[in-house]
């Protein structure tokens, strides 16, 4: 039976090594208590392909101290989530908001057909920050 997971490995020659690395060794997988005041949660999805991405941030003094994600989707979606959490850790909220899907896509060398994965990651970052700011009246 062909599953998305197996399909990724059968087509791995079509992916850049950075996508394969983040897919096989995802960074920052996990979650936080979404009700905590220092946690922001972004949940985004792409109905066309079924990818769903949850990205959470833990903030202290306007700095994202930690980030976690859980993604149901293709290898490119998982890699985009993993990279996004790496990039925002240690950054200020304002600097994290400057990360774009183009930055993520370029770093991972995503093909045009997978650009929606990097868009989900950008949207998840923004949604998590927005959630944190709303919780804290910012």
Swiss-Prot record:
It comes from the Eukaryota. Binds 1 [2Fe-2S] cluster per subunit. This is Iron sulfur cluster assembly protein 1. It comes from Trachipleistophora hominis. InterPro entries: ISCU, NIF_FeS_clus_asmbl_NifU_N. Its main location: cytoplasm. Component of the core Fe-S cluster (ISC) assembly machinery. It is found in: Cytoplasm. Pathway: Cofactor biosynthesis; iron-sulfur cluster biosynthesis. Signal peptide: none annotated. SUPFAM superfamilies: SufE/NifU. GO terms for cellular component: cytoplasm. Its cofactor is [2Fe-2S] cluster. NCBIfam families: iscU. Belongs to the NifU family.
């Amino acid at each position: 039976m062909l599953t998305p997971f197996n399909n990724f490995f059968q087509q791995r020659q079509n992916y850049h090594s950075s996508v394969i690395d983040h897919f096989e060794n995802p960074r920052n997988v996990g979650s936080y208590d979404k009700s905590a005041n220092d946690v922001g949660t972004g949940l985004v999805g792409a109905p066309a392909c079924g990818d769903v991405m949850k990205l959470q941030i833990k903030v202290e003094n306007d700095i994202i101290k930690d980030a976690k994600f859980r993604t149901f989707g293709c290898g490119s979606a998982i890699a985009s989530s993993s990279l996004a959490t790496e990039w925002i850790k240690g950054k200020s909220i304002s600097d994290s908001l400057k990360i774009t899907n183009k930055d993520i896509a370029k770093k991972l060398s995503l093909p045009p057909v997978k650009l929606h994965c990097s868009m989900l990651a950008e949207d998840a970052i923004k949604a998590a920050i927005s959630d944190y700011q709303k919780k804290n009246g910012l």
